Structure formats: structure tokens, C-alpha cells
């Protein structure tokens, strides 16, 4: 965060991260699907699918008519609020440097109470409040995610389709995540599904 000269560089980095991590995720999911097919086929469940009965193939072999894989993005509103905070406070208003913001996060906001209060206040743009400033950043991230996932093939002859749903995993994910630029402290839940945090 302290090496970027422009916010466009930040957005480019976000896109690169989405590309890298969606590659990792899709590869991992394909390995898991191959393992299911080889180690744990589902003949009993497959018997309830007319398509599987007609094709003579197990669900894990692509016996069903629809064979999509739908990985779900989690914490998107948290990320949108992070980008909004960076854009507003570091680049647009220059109220804090990237290095200072990064240090506050590394310190879990301890010793940075004024900045913590500002980031969590209505003075900073937040996603989901009919605020185009932050909502456009959510849109950008979701478009990155969709672009890097949509149309990829899975092991069953289907395709990956992006979604945004954390169910209740956002709590566990937050427990294992350090503090974030949006004013979330270490261990606090990340955003739920597509819902706003602030």
C-alpha cells in the first residue's frame, strides 16, 4: 500500500490478485472434483438423476445435464470499503499516507484511535449506502471476479459460474483474518454475503 503512486495502480493490483487467486481456486476445485470421481463416486445419489440413468454416468463423471461449479466470493463489501477508504483518505483527500494506514492495520488499530474513528464514520464513503463512490468500487471488484471465473471448465464438462454468498462462513473467515483497512479489527467477521457493513 505504501508503494502505489496512484489509485489506478491499486485497482490494477486488485485485478491481478483476483486473477491469481481465482486461478488457484479453480485449479484446487478441479483437483477436488477429480478426487471425488476417483475416490468417492456417488452411485446412490446419481440414481435419483434421470440424466445420470440415461447416460450411465455418475454425477461425479458429468452424468447430469447441468454440471456447473459455483464458487462464492466472500467479504466483497469489506473489500469495497477498504478500497473506498484507500481511495478517499490516501489518494483523494491525502489525510493519511498509505504507509500510515498500513501501520494502523498492522497494529490492529491500537494507538490509531482517531484514524479508526474516522474510517468507521459517515465521513468516509461506504458500500451499500446508495453512495456511488463506494458502490462503483464494489462493482469493479465483482466484475474482476466474474471476468476471471466465468466460462472456465470444470472436470465434469460444465463451467464455473461466479456468485457472492458467504452463508455464515464470514464469521469463521473473520476469526482467521488480520485487521483490514475498512476499520475491521483482527478476528471480527468479514462482510456477510453482499450486505453492507457500515
Name what the model sees in each region.
Residues 1-198:
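Acidic, glycine-enriched catalytic cores built around paired aspartates
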Amino acid at each position: 500500500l505504501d508503494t502505489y503512486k496512484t489509485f489506478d495502480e491499486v485497482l490494477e493490483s486488485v485485478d491481478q490478485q483476483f486473477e491469481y487467486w481465482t486461478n488457484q481456486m479453480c485449479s484446487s476445485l478441479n483437483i477436488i472434483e477429480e478426487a471425488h470421481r476417483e475416490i468417492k463416486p456417488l452411485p446412490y445419489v446419481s440414481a435419483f438423476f434421470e440424466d445420470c440413468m440415461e447416460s450411465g454416468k455418475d454425477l461425479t463423471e458429468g452424468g447430469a445435464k447441468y454440471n456447473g461449479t459455483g464458487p462464492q466470493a466472500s467479504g466483497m463489501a469489506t473489500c469495497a470499503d477498504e478500497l473506498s477508504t484507500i481511495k478517499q483518505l490516501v489518494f483523494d483527500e491525502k489525510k493519511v499516507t498509505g504507509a500510515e494506514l498500513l501501520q494502523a492495520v498492522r497494529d490492529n488499530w491500537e494507538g490509531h484511535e482517531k484514524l479508526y474513528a474516522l474510517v468507521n464514520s459517515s465521513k468516509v464513503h461506504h458500500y451499500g449506502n446508495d453512495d456511488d463512490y463506494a458502490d462503483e468500487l464494489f462493482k469493479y471488484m465483482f466484475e474482476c471476479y466474474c471476468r476471471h471465473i466465468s466460462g472456465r471448465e470444470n472436470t465434469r464438462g460444465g463451467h464455473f459460474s461466479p456468485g457472492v454468498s458467504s452463508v455464515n462462513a464470514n464469521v469463521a473467515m473473520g476469526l482467521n483474518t488480520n485487521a483490514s483497512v475498512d476499520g475491521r479489527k483482527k478476528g471480527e467477521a468479514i462482510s456477510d454475503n453482499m450486505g453492507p457493513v457500515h
